[in-house]
Every structure is written in structure tokens, then in C-alpha cells.
Amino acid sequence: MVHYISPAPLTFEVIDKILSKNYKLALSEDSKKLINDCKAYLDHKIESSAKPLYGITTGFGSLCKISISKEDLSQLQANLVMSHACSLGEPIHQDIIRLMLLLKAHALSLGKSGVQLVTVERIIDMFNHNVLPVVRELGSLGASGDLAPLANLFLPLINEGEVWYKGKICDAKAINAKLGWAPIELGAKEGLALLNGTQFMSSHAVYALLKAFKIAKYADIIGALSLEAYDGRIDPFLPQIQAARPHPGQIETARNIRTLLEGSEFQQKEKTHVQDPYSFRCMPQVHGASKDSIMYVASVVEREINSVTDNPTIFMEDDLIISGGNFHGQPLALVMDFLSIALAELGSISERRTYRLISGDRGNIPEFLVANPGLNSGFMIPQYAAAAIVSKNKQLCTPCSVDSIPSSNEQEDHVSMGGNAATKTVKVAENVERILAIELMNAAQAIDLQR
């Protein structure tokens, strides 16, 4: 199956299909025309204009006052990619690398970047042949785009760097030769278009959100099972309560749990307690608030992945090349901090339900979910593990977007730290999956003990 990159917006549903069903990528004819027309326009402007064009006929960052001769324009771009390729730390997940390639190809195809068609086609070839550049998680300030990681992503275009190929890290030059791919001679502005952009942040954001959509669903299912095991009351999930405070996520969560427990033999039993602890009773309010937050974050990220975030930006229809600030990652930095908090709360309330299930405070299930507590420790220590992970998430949820360290001789005097916000949000999401898995195991054991 093939996804044709076109001016049509990317959606999470489309991206999920591309990743999960191993779609190939191709450029639509509309996108090819936009790329070619923009490149021709840029070449004409360089030839006909004596006016300096940032990053095209000048140096970069605080070196923007230095003019570059026309003979050196291609070398300028190659030098940029090589000098900026300094991402550090652990290699990022290969699905996130695939997302980076997809999102960059989509952004460049919108016809405002001035790149060669052959460059975009090579990015697509890398995606389709699963030749994935090695990109590491540290090094982006999240302003001027994601310079260091994107430089590592595109080193293989010029026969440099390393790639994942058939499960191994290989020299990019060797894999290019094996596949018959000649190195790309970067044109004017092209290195800048590749490196200036928010695709490191946005690919992590998309990856985290695809997990978040599932986590929000699983939290309701696992929470409903825990409510059953704990002999909890259904009353707090009745529609009248939700109508009195009609937040969409709250209404959805309560409806989900009512549906899951409809006809349950446990719910038909007489209850001796008047109410349940908050971790059960307030699932609609807590899960629902996280759901609403996730949907807000998704709206921002979907807008971002369909935007042009390199600089300068070319507007052929207005005969303008504008040096602006669309590369600044503040929109993503803020919502990634928000998403990490929303997800962490799903983990926090889950761990509290796990604690209640092993506490023996209801009398319907034994302490630590084991027939002979004392002789056996039962499910004591999985709760320790969940608590440790919850604590770790609290550390990770310290906002990154409140920080800024100036760079490039103060030319770039405010940065978003969105790269750090995005990478830690993926870690929070993965941690919440672990916490929910522990709750599921405890809830299933508690149910079995009552059969």
C-alpha cells in the first residue's frame, strides 16, 4: 500500500496506518509541481537579486552578516549539515526516525522551502527501504528548529553518517553504494531547509500521542476491572452526575465504564459501603481531564505537522522570501509539558487503585492478593515498582518549556527546549503503560480470587 504525499493535511489516523501497516511513500503530481516551481523561483531570485538572502547567500545564526559567493553556495549547505550533526546520547526509536522522514518530506512538499525534487525523493527512498539514519536523543534546543538531530538525520544524503539497515548500524556511504544511491549535491538553501524545522519535536509528539490515545482507552478498561475487583459502586458513573459538570472527557469516561460493567454480577450484589476512595470514584473526573488535555495537545500537534517550519520561507505567489521564526518550538514545548502531566496523572491514579487492591481493606479480597499472606508475599512488590515509576514520572514532569539558554552569540536569545520536552514525554507515556500493566495484573488476580 502507498501513501501519496500531497498538499492534503496529514492526520493521526493516516500516520498510524502508515506506520502500523508499513505503507510506502510516494509524491503526488501536485507536490512534485510545488517543489519544482519553488526551486525554480528560488534559483531565479538568487541569479537576479543583489539583496542578501539569509542562509542562502549569507552565513548562519550570528554569522548572518557574512556574504557567501555564488560558487560556494552548495558547499555552504553541505558544511552546514556536517558541522551541525552533533546529537548525543542514546539512539532514538526507529519508528520516531521514520516519523521524522515522513514529516520532513511532507513539509518540504508544500512548496515553500526551495529544495530539489531529487532531495525529497531520496528522503522517501530512505523511508521506503527502511534505511534509517542514526539520530540521538540529546542536542536540540527546540529553536532554529531541531538543528543537531536533523543534521544527523540528513548526513546520509551527502554520504556521511550512520544508518540503521537490516537491524544493524552501518556506514551510510556503504549502504548508499549497496543501493546504488549517489550522494545528493545540495543546492542553495537546501541544507538550511533540511535542518531548520521542528520534525524532531513533532515526531516525538506524534509518537507520544499515538500511545496516549491507547493509554486513555486502556485506563478506562483496566480501571473498570479494578472497580469490579474492589466491589466498587457504579453510582458515581451515572449520567446525571456527568451532566451536572459536562466536561467531554468526563462524560466519555463514565459512559465507557458503565458500558463495560453493564450486566455485571459484581454490580448486582448488595453494597455495604456508602462510597469508594477517590481513585475509583473520581475516575470520570481524572481520566476525563487527561482525555480533554490529550485532545487539546493533538489539535496543536496536528496543526504543527501540517505547517512549514523552516527558515527563510518562500512565498512565490507574493514574490517574497521572508526570514521569520516558524522554526521556534514553543507551541510544541508547552503542549509536550502538558501532555506529560496529563499522562502521568493516569499513572498516578492507577497506582493508587493497585494499592487499594492489595491492601485488604475491603474484606472481599485478601492482603496482597494471595491465599496465605505472610507465608507468601503475593503481589506486594509490583506495587513498589508502580510507585517507583510514578515517582520517576513526577521528576520527568518538571516543565522543560520554562527554561531557555541563549545561543549563537545571543542571536538566538530565546529557545523553547522543546526537544527535551518531547523526548521526556515519550518516556512518561512508556512508564504509564508499565503502571497500567501492573494494575491490570492485580485486578485480574483480585477477580480470580472471588470466583
Predicted ranges, named:
Residues Y54-I68, D72-L76, S83-H106, R136-I158, ...:
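FAD-binding core of FAD-dependent oxidoreductases
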Residues L10, V14-K17, K21, I66-I96, ...:
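Glycine-/small-residue-rich beta-strand-loop submotif within the FAD-binding core of flavoenzymes
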Residues S203, P239-A243, C282, S323-G324, ...:
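Short beta-alpha connecting loops at secondary-structure transitions
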Residues M1-A50:
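N- or domain-start disorder-to-order transition segments that initiate the globular core
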Residues S226-S348:
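Accessory "access/gating" subregions that flank catalytic or transport cores
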Residues P149-N256, D403-P406, N420-Q450:
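Mobile "lid/hinge" segments at catalytic clefts and subdomain interfaces of large enzymes
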Residues S109, A151-E162, S203-A216, D220, ...:
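Alpha-helical support elements that line or immediately flank enzyme active sites
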Residues A143-N152, V297, V301-S401, S407-S408:
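Glycine-rich anion/phosphate-binding loop at the beta-strand->alpha-helix junction
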